[in-house]
UniProtKB/Swiss-Prot annotation:
Low complexity bias (residue ranges): 23-37
Primary role: Phosphorylates diacylglycerol (DAG) to generate phosphatidic acid (PA).
Paired cysteines (S-S): none
Catalytic function, reaction form: a 1,2-diacyl-sn-glycerol + ATP = a 1,2-diacyl-sn-glycero-3-phosphate + ADP + H(+)
Family note: Belongs to the eukaryotic diacylglycerol kinase family.
This protein's record includes keyword Membrane: no
Pfam family, one: DAGK_cat
Subcellular compartments: Cytoplasm
Name the UniProt record assigns to this protein: Diacylglycerol kinase eta
Enzyme class: transferase
Species of origin: Drosophila simulans
UniProt record, GO biological process: glycerolipid metabolic process; phospholipase C-activating G protein-coupled receptor signaling pathway
GO MF assignments: ATP binding; ATP-dependent diacylglycerol kinase activity; zinc ion binding
Polar residues bias (residue ranges): 1164-1176
Top-level taxonomy: Eukaryota, Metazoa, Ecdysozoa, Arthropoda, Hexapoda
Length: 1905
């Protein structure tokens, strides 16, 4: 540092080593000084170039400066200013073209760089006079150059996006400071400023700098060119150029603005000087302008007109903008940018359709950069955006104020989807139309829209823009890909740091626990069992202690530890039960008991039920009774081993939860080990009996791949939203075992047990300040604490008998028994919630006494168990009096159990008095514990029993606050009750076990009545409690129900209902005790944050109690009429009431029963009496659709009650039903047992279901709710939320002939329209067959129109296929010429399933069980699957889903997505290998061949499940599934196949029909073959919604529109999102416009010719004498005519039968030919052209007549071979020569002949290359060619107006027909032909030098006058 001065230092460049040492010493000195001067010392080092190869100099720079100044600054100095951008770039070196990585830092007007960011010394560059430009033109290496007056750097970025970011940052760093630092304004800096955008390029001709006017240096004129305005400059002059680039806005026009008198602004010309294109012509004088010698003349950047300097003043002021005027946004129309970041636009006059262009600079062959620049040259630069740089949002924001505009996306399908998604975000569907230019690889959407497969040439963009201007509009369906992803554990931040030793110890403990659990489950040795049990308890205790030490303050972990201890106690209980019979009194029992005593949780504060000091619980004798009931149920006949396995798995899951909670950051491999090992270790062998066991893993015969372990994140299961228990085949048994959804924990399970140490207190403050304690509990079914006799044991029981005694509670206090803590089978799922109890609420409680009677439970041995009285604590319960229970009701403080099989003396069967076997309804319901939390009601009658209270829970005493009955303005709804809410929360299996009803869905149940032959009576359920002689009243005639029925029958009390309140109910009992139930209603709940159900959703109503009995509700339950074949009808209301109401009754009969069409009989003023009179023929019968009620509840007097008209079944039983508004009835009359099939509700009679179908419960916890695809949509929704069909009309009055007597499926189904308000018919669904109704009943329905879609079409329940085929046959017979509309055809058929799925090689989903259980007893959603997808899905159906993306083209899962994903990864890894479309296709082929060998997606059918419109589709062995929206897949493959058969069941595919095509992919060979062969066997279905369930725990590749990713397990729903306007190519319109423009052009030419006499006289004077070249063409013409005359005469002589007039024509042509060369000498002067007219006419007539004769008689002529050849050649030559001749009428009125002078030296060769004569004769193309041949002259004006056909003819005459296709493709007309240069010909494919010279010479000859 001795050479360093204080201010500056000038040093000659030293060798590398010495300079390094100098720098290092400088750094050390700077570091040692310790102080920094406030004024930075910036050394300036002047360096000479004497061999330093590290300094960067661009190899492109042709004018390097001799001396560059290098400035260096220290790190602390350049840190003072704000950094605009920094990062690594590659810097080009001078030697060997090398690149070196350097770290750059950009600041205001300064650029610094060094080797890395930690360097202390940076080289700095002053950017005050900066010039920067892109080095490449094809986006090859993303390099750009920076030039300043002192430095020049060539830098390279990793991607074009990064390069453009640096260029934009350089603009920001050098731009002047603006007061507002708005990011949007920064983005608009390029648009609003007129700065040039330079790039380095070379030129083929001399080019001159627009700044210094000197020629660009080098042979190739290398320099910089602006990509917008084509301004040319030297690199050294770029910084000096003025900002006069192409205008963008009105402000950029500046002083050139021209304003008219009326205030309107005219678009002026924007001139650029010099460097004009080849053969430019002055727009004023029509002479050539431009020069290669100097910079002269002007060109307009908008209209592309060129003028001389002298002619420019004569040019029109207004600029016509050019050929793309319709698409250009004139800069004078864009005034400013408004506050909402959109242009303030003033639309120009005339036609205006602005075009917004998005170009992806990376698409396809990397042609995007060329198109980007070309579009900026043709349009306003502010209309063109690079998707890579700015994305679509900027352009859409700017165009927001345009009323209508078009969007052109120049890219592949992925970018099109990106733009469409942004259009969705801005909601601009109605104001924009989208077109696609195929620049990508696949370009499927562009193919379908008609824009071709590729567009690589930007030369003819003006013509391409014209095509987009004439395009037509079509609607493109867009589909939402809704994803419900399974929660997969991800590493989180650890809560405690455990060292490697501690982690190993923790893992060892878990492994040891698993080892001991395995021994406990599998061993039969007592000593091993004792040892393993002790060791397990010690290990668990040690594990809990160690983890608790690190988490003393973690309450959630403490709870999990207590859960683990409780599960361990339950395991010990199970061991005790298992061993107590065989090893009573031995060491094992003693050991287990000691361990139980030792393992009881000792932390009272962590137990939820101990947090409330006033409440504790102990199991009572009721638990033993429940245990016995469960043990006796069919589904729980499992061995103790299986119960023990469940307990062991439960312990393992609890251990996993504890470890996972303590170590959330543990590696994924360890989590996988913990989650998968338990079931692998503890799974027992399959039960040989074939019965479904509740604890084994219910896997199918072929287990799916990578099933998700049920042990994963078990704690999340407590958050499952309340779901019905109905299950479908479409969900995997282990699917979604761990989900985390916002729902109340107490609603997670549908089973609530009584013996639960859990009290959930919810303080309801809505009803007069009264407090209601609601207790709910969940329990596990697994045989825990149950002995061999089926009795439930208490934890400390010694095997003695507990005899319950009768006990009466004559005070209000309900005892809650306390005692030792109870081991609970599902305590880990117990919600640990504590609710504080307010003291003032307790004081407000008013006591009301309750008599609670415990019935005697008689054991099998006759002994009466004794009940042990325990401690009690009293809870004040307001307003309820309970009377003694019936004998079959068991009540406790927390639960009431109704034993439906108990023998009661007061109840007998209403149909049979005989005794019989017991039918356990609880066992029929499920393998779960059926228990319901007791609910306390206000102001009940003292005479009511507990059974009455529970049975009348639907008496509207306790409802949702959203319900209409809670409103002060409305009446209560019939049937709306707490029972419905509880049923949706707890599951219908439990709640309707009390009524012996099983529901088909949580929202849709059909009130049913079953009439069968007499059977032995079963034990009565409580649902028949009040139907016997002792209890004559129905349960709905109890006091609360009486009031309801009184209002229902009154006109003064209209009812309310909404669509969400419609429910269906099916009575599935096999006994003959039938009971008509009123319809169930459900309401919507309110939600609080997190989608939890709000407490205020429940509300008590103070209803007036009516104690009087309603006689109207008494009517016979059955009426046996076995011989009555007529219709027994109920009385009806008046006609005017029925005219405003319609409802539905569905009747299901036996298979053998036939459907009878019943006609309604109108009988007004009849009151609920059975009518036996036969029905009368009503008026005009109409086929009425099913009426679905609107979503909005009705109010007030708009609804009147009515009584439905019900038919009598053919079985003889009269279906008696009273329907109020809102009732839907169904009567099941099949003789066989009908039971809803579910894992929780197996059939009573159909036992074979259990083997194959009862496997939708979870393997480790069958009571825990699992999801299925349809019900998962109800997550986070109201407990009583119903499935709604969106409002829309699907009603249509059908032809009466279609309503035939026909039974469908296994049932006879009849539908009756009964009651519905006519003004609320928002949604209607068509069901066939329909029953005629009188017109007066439906005043408004007949006018509604809609689709013909069937409600059950596509469902497996009813076989409507033959109905559809019958209708199809009928339509074909009725009128074959009549074409059905696509909408009717679509809605009539969908979903269309391929019949091949029913072949033996496709798997059958109907194996095992009966058709009834799988179809009728499935969800109501299945029945409505064909209707609801037609509508927009309700938001509640998609709760829990999120939109992953939007599909426009196709969706693929499996092998195709795997190939796309591999290609994407390859392109990201090696982008240089994927820059060509051909290379991309090659990579696709290679990756597809790779899949042919690897088969990574093999057995995909085991990993996914497919549903189409709600119908499960069986899948064969396949590797992929493709769902098509457009008929093009992965690069133009018609994967669906073309439909050629007339009897094809599928609809023709289209992208605007709202229909998806589902296709199976069997392998890569099929994908390759589908490009060549029309394959159809792989079709699966056509539908309107698709659901795919991904099973297992591995991700599966998925692609949407070519964009692929890995999708985790979950559910995918494809639903219709919206439609967007797309521009399709309209070729017919293009041809019409082209022909019209051609006519206009010809007309203008004729006008100009008539007007310009001087030009015509000049033409006449020059054309009088035939030139030398024309003379040569004339000789060839004479030769051709002579030859043709000769051979035609010879033909006539050889065949005298031919016409002799042809011989005369030949002689006349010969004479005319002789007249132009008398005595062998051609005429001279003007007379020759006049004589030639006669020769041309006669020779043309001879040619035409000869061709006509040969065409007519050629098939019968037998010519000599030589004659045929010579005649063909003569005719061909004659045709070619005639094309060169033209006859024109001159000014003097005479006709003269002219010849086209076209390369006469090679005319003979050209004739030989023409098409064969006979081919032209047979195709008839000769006449067609003649009509397009306009008259031609040798003048430039004529050639300038040539069409494409004439240019092609011109090429053929030059024997250059090989270039015809290229000229046609590029639409080369006469105007373009005259301006073609060498470079243009090269672009057109003319590469041969000789051909180029000939074409250029011919063009020159055409241009000469």
């Amino acid at each position: 540092m001795s050479h360093l001065k204080l201010d500056t230092l000038h040093v000659q460049r030293s060798p590398r080593g010495s300079r390094r040492s100098s720098r290092s010493s400088g750094r050390s000195s700077a570091c040692s000084s310790g102080s920094i001067s406030p004024v930075p010392i910036i050394p300036i080092i002047s360096i000479s170039h004497d061999g330093d190869e590290s300094e960067s100099e661009s190899e492109i720079e042709t004018e390097p400066a001799r001396l560059f100044q290098r400035r260096m600054s220290i790190k602390c100095t350049n840190n003072l200013a704000a950094i605009i951008k920094e990062g690594f770039l590659l810097k080009h070196t001078w030697s060997f073209q090398r690149w070196r990585r350097r770290y750059f830092r950009l600041k205001r007007n300064m650029l610094f760089y060094a080797k890395d960011e930690k360097c202390d010394v940076f080289d700095d560059i002053d950017l005050s006079d900066l010039c920067y430009f892109e080095c490449g033109i094809k986006n090859v290496n993303h390099s750009f150059q920076i030039i300043t007056p002192t430095r020049s750097l060539v830098l390279c970025a990793e991607s074009r996006r990064e390069m453009e970011d640096w260029l934009g940052s350089l603009k920001t760093a050098t731009a002047p400071q603006r007061p507002r630092g708005d990011s949007f304004l920064i983005e608009q800096h390029d648009i609003l400023s007129n700065h040039h955008h330079w790039y380095a390029t070379s030129h083929a001709r001399p080019t001159y700098c627009n700044v210094c006017r000197d020629a660009l240096s080098g042979v190739t004129s290398h320099g910089l060119s602006c990509e917008v305005c084509k301004c040319k400059v030297h690199k050294r002059c770029a910084a000096k150029s003025i900002a006069n680039c192409k205008w963008t806005t009105l402000a950029s026009v500046g002083k050139d603005i021209i304003e008219q008198a009326d205030g309107s602004i005219i678009m002026p010309h924007q001139w650029m000087e010099g460097n004009l294109p080849v053969s430019s012509m002055c727009a004023v004088c029509k002479k050539t302008c431009g020069s290669v010698l100097r910079l002269q003349d002007w060109r307009c950047l908008w209209c592309r007109a060129t003028v001389h300097v002298a002619c420019r003043p004569q040019m029109a002021v207004a600029c016509p903008i050019g050929p793309a005027k319709l698409s250009v946004v004139p800069p004078t129309s864009v005034h400013s940018i408004s506050t909402d970041d959109a242009w303030d636009v003033a639309s120009p006059k005339g036609n205006f359709s602005p075009l917004l262009v998005f170009v992806n600079s990376k698409s396809g062959d990397n042609q995007g950069v060329k198109f980007l620049r070309r579009f900026k040259q043709l349009l306003n630069p502010a209309q063109v955006f690079d998707l890579i740089s700015t994305g679509p949002s900027l352009g859409l924001r700017l165009f927001r104020h345009f009323e209508m505009f078009r969007i052109l996306v120049c890219s592949g399908d992925g970018s099109v989807g990106w733009v469409l998604s942004e259009i969705d975000r801005f909601n601009m569907h109605k104001q924009c139309q989208v077109a696609v230019m195929p620049l990508g690889t696949g370009n499927d959407l562009a193919r379908v829209l008609g824009w071709g497969s590729s567009c690589d040439d930007d030369t003819h963009l003006p013509q391409i823009l014209e095509r987009y201007e004439s395009a037509s509009t079509k609607m493109l369906d867009r589909w939402s890909i809704m994803v419900f992803e399974k929660a997969i554990p991800v590493p989180k931040t650890p809560k405690m740091s455990i060292s490697t030793e501690q982690e190993a110890m923790l893992t060892g403990m878990v492994t040891s626990a698993n080892h001991h659990l395995r021994f406990i489950v599998e061993t039969n040795d007592t000593q091993t069992l004792i040892s393993s049990t002790r060791n397990l308890c010690d290990t668990v205790d040690d594990l809990v202690c160690r983890i608790s030490e690190h988490h003393k303050d973690d309450e959630q972990l403490a709870v999990k530890c207590d859960i683990l201890r409780q599960k361990l106690n339950m395991l010990l209980d199970a061991l005790q039960e298992e061993e107590i019979g065989a090893h009573s009194g031995d060491d094992l029992i003693a050991t287990i008991r000691s361990l139980i005593a030792r393992s009881i949780p000792v932390t009272p504060g962590s137990n939820a039920y101990l947090l409330n000091p006033n409440i504790s619980i102990e199991k009572t004798e009721k638990d033993q009774i429940n245990s016995k009931e469960r043990r006796n149920s069919r589904s729980l006949r499992s061995s103790e081993k299986e119960a023990l396995q469940c307990r062991a798995n439960s312990v393992k899951r609890a251990i996993y939860n504890v470890v996972e909670h303590s170590e959330p950051g543990r590696p994924k491999r360890y989590q996988r080990k913990l989650s998968i090992t338990p079931f692998e270790a503890l799974k027992l062998p399959t039960n040989a009996s074939g019965e479904s066991t509740p604890c084994t893993s219910p896997l199918p015969i072929i287990p799916p791949i990578n099933i998700i372990s049920p042990t994963m994140e078990t704690s999340r299961l407590t958050c499952i939203s309340p779901l019905p228990d109905t299950r479908r085949d479409s969900v995997d048994e282990n699917f979604f075992n761990s989900i985390n959804l916002p729902a109340p924990r107490q609603f997670a399970d549908s089973r609530r047990s009584s013996g639960v140490p859990e009290v959930i207190q919810e303080i309801e403050e809505g009803a007069n300040g009264e407090t209601v304690y609601r207790r709910s509990r969940m329990s596990l079914t697994g045989g825990a604490n149950i002995d061999d006799a089926g009795n439930r044991l208490s934890p400390c029981s010694d095997g003695g008998e507990n005899t319950p005694t009768e006990r009466k509670v004559d005070f209000l206090r309900v005892p809650i028994h306390t005692g030792e803590p109870i081991v609970d089978p599902l305590c880990d799922y117990r919600p640990h919630e504590v609710f504080e109890q307010k003291e003032n609420d307790k004081e407000k409680d008013k006591p009301v006494e309750i008599d609670m009677e415990r019935d005697t439970c008689v054991e099998k041995d006759g002994s009466v168990p004794e009940e042990k009285l325990v401690h009690t604590c009293n809870i004040q319960v307001p307003g309820v009096v309970v009377t003694p229970n019936p004998q079959n009701v068991y009540s406790s403080a927390s639960i009431t159990i109704i034993d439906t099989d108990a023998q009661t003396t007061t109840e007998q069967s209403s149909s049979d008095d005989l005794g019989g076997e017991a039918s356990d309804v609880l066992s029929a319901i499920s393998n779960e514990e059926c228990s319901v939390a007791s609910e306390i009601f206000d102001k009940q009658d003292a005479g009511q029993t507990v059974g009455d209270i529970i049975q009348n829970m639907d008496a509207s005493n306790f409802t949702h606050i959203d319900s209409p009955e809670t409103s002060d303005e409305t009446e209560a709804m019939p049937g709306e009750s707490i029972m419905d809410d509880i049923s949706s929360v707890l599951g219908h299996d439990i709640t309707y076990a009390l009524q012996d009803n099983t529901l088909t869905d949580d929202t849709t149940t059909l009130c049913s009545e079953h009439v069968g032959p007499p059977k032995p009576p079963r034990k009565k359920s409580l649902s028949a409690l009040s139907r016997t002689q002792a209890h004559p009243r129905r349960r709905n005639s109890s006091p609360p129900r009486i009031a309801r029925l009184a209002r229902m029958d009154s006109d003064d009390n209209p009812q309310q209902f909404g669509f969400e309140n419609i429910v269906f109910e099916i009575d599935n009992r096999c006994d003959d005790q039938k009971m008509r139930e009123p319809p169930r209603y459900c309401s919507l709940a309110q939600f609080v944050e997190g989608n939890d159900i709000a407490r205020q959703s429940f509300k008590q109503l103070m209803l007036e109690q009516h104690r009087g009995e309603d006689n109207d509700s008494e009517y016979p339950e059955h009426q046996q009429t076995p011989t009555n074949k007529g219709a027994n009808l109920l009385a009806t209301t008046s006609e005017d009431e029925l005219s405003t109401q319609t409802a539905i009754k569905i009747e299901i009969q036996d298979i053998d029963a036939t459907v009878r069409n019943l006609n309604s009989s109108m009988k007004p003023n009849t009151i609920l009496t059975t009518s036996t009179s036969p029905t009368k023929k009503s008026g005009h019968g109409q086929d009425i659709s099913v009426v679905v009620r609107p979503p909005t509840p009705l109010r007030g007097d708009s609804i009147k009650p009515t009584v439905s008209l019900l038919p009598v079944s053919s079985g003889g039983a009269m279906a008696v039903s009273m329907t109020c508004s809102g009732m839907l009835g169904v009567r099941a009359m099949n003789a066989s047992e009908i039971r809803r099939h579910s894992s929780h509700a197996p059939g009573l009679a159909v036992r074979e279901f259990d083997k194959d179908k009862d496997r939708r419960h979870s393997g480790f916890n069958p009571n825990q709710l699992t999801l299925d695809p349809e019900h998962a949509r109800f997550l986070s929704s109201s407990p009583a939320a119903s499935r709604r069909i969106s409002c829309g009309s699907l009603f249509k009055v059908k032809n009466k002939k279609i309503a035939t007597k026909r039974s469908y499926g296994l049932f006879s189904v009849r539908f009756f329209v009964v009651a519905e308000p006519d003004f609320r018919l928002a949604t209607l669904a068509l069901i066939r067959p329909l029953i005629p109704l009188p017109n007066e009943a439906l005043p408004n329905l007949q006018t509604l129109k809609g689709s013909k879609s069937s409600l059950f079409m596509g469902s497996t329940l009813f076989g409507f296929d033959h109905l559809a085929s019958a209708e199809r046959d009928k339509e074909e017979k009725g009128g074959k010429d009549k074409e059905k509309t696509p909408t009717e055809e679509t809605n009539r058929k969908l979903p269309i399933i391929n019949p091949l799925v029913r072949l033996p090689n496709w798997p059958n989903l109907a194996n095992g069980g009966g058709f009834i259980s799988k179809c009728l007893l499935a969800n109501a959603d299945t029945l409505c699957a064909a209707v609801s997808p037609l509508m927009d899905p309700d938001e509640t159906l998609l709760a829990g889903y999120h939109e992953k993306c939007v599909m426009n083209n196709y969706f693929g899962i499996g092998i195709d997505a795997k190939i796309s994903l591999d290609f994407h990864n390859k392109r990201e890894e090696h982008p240089e290998k994927c820059r060509s479309r051909a290379r991309n296709y090659m990579w696709y082929g290679v990756l597809g061949s790779k899949q042919l060998l690897q088969k990574t997606c093999k057995n995909l059918e085991q990993r996914v499940q497919l549903e189409c419109d709600g119908q499960r589709i069986p899948l064969p062995e396949l590797q992929g599934i493709v769902i098509l929206n457009i008929p093009s897949f992965m690069g133009g493959t018609n994967f669906w196949g073309s439909s050629t058969k007339k009897d094809d069941i599928f609809l023709p595919p289209s992208f605007d029909d709202r229909v998806l095509e589902v296709v199976a992919v069997f392998g890569s060979v099929q994908m390759a073959a589908s490009r060549l062969i029309n394959l159809q066997h792989h079709r699966i279905a056509q539908c309107q919604s698709v659901q795919i369930n991904i099973l297992g725990d591995e991700e599966i590749p998925i692609q949407v529109d070519g964009e692929a990713w890995l999708q985790p397990p979950g559910m995918i729903r494809i639903l219709h999102k919206n439609r967007v306007q797309m521009l399709c190519r309209n070729r017919s319109l293009e041809l019409s416009l082209k022909s019209w423009q051609e006519k206009q052009r010809q007309h203008s030419i004729s006008i100009q010719r008539d007007a310009s006499s001087t030009a015509s006289e000049h033409a006449n004077s020059t054309d009088e004498v035939i030139s030398e070249r024309e003379c040569y063409v004339l000789l060839n013409f004479i030769e051709a005519v002579s030859s043709l005359v000769k051979w035609v005469k010879f033909l006539i002589i050889s065949h005298p039968a031919l016409q002799h007039d042809l011989y005369e024509v030949a002689c006349r042509a010969s004479e005319a030919l002789e007249s132009i060369h008398p005595q062998g000498k051609l005429l001279e002067g003007p007379s020759l052209r006049t004589k030639l007219v006669e020769v041309i006419d006669s020779s043309r007539q001879l040619y035409d007549d000869a061709c006509t004769l040969l065409r007519d008689r050629g098939h019968s002529l037998i010519l000599r071979e030589d004659l045929e050849t010579k005649l063909s050649a003569a005719l061909a030559n004659m045709e070619m020569e005639l094309k060169k001749c033209s006859v024109q009428k001159c000014i003097d009125g005479k006709l003269r002949a002219y010849f086209n002078v076209l390369a006469p030296n090679e005319e003979v060769d050209g004739r030989r290359k023409s098409r064969p004569f006979w081919v032209r004769l047979r195709s008839g193309s000769t006449a067609g060619q003649q009509q397009f041949k306009p008259p031609m002259t040798n003048t430039r004006e004529a050639a300038n107006n040539w069409s494409v056909n004439e240019v092609v003819t011109w090429l053929e005459t030059m024997q250059l027909s090989e270039y015809v296709d290229s000229f046609l493709k590029n639409d080369i007309r006469g105007k373009e032909l005259l301006t073609l240069g060498r470079r243009d010909l090269k672009d057109l494919g003319v590469v041969k030098v000789g051909h180029v010279k000939r074409i250029l010479q011919a063009i020159k000859d055409l241009s000469e006058n």
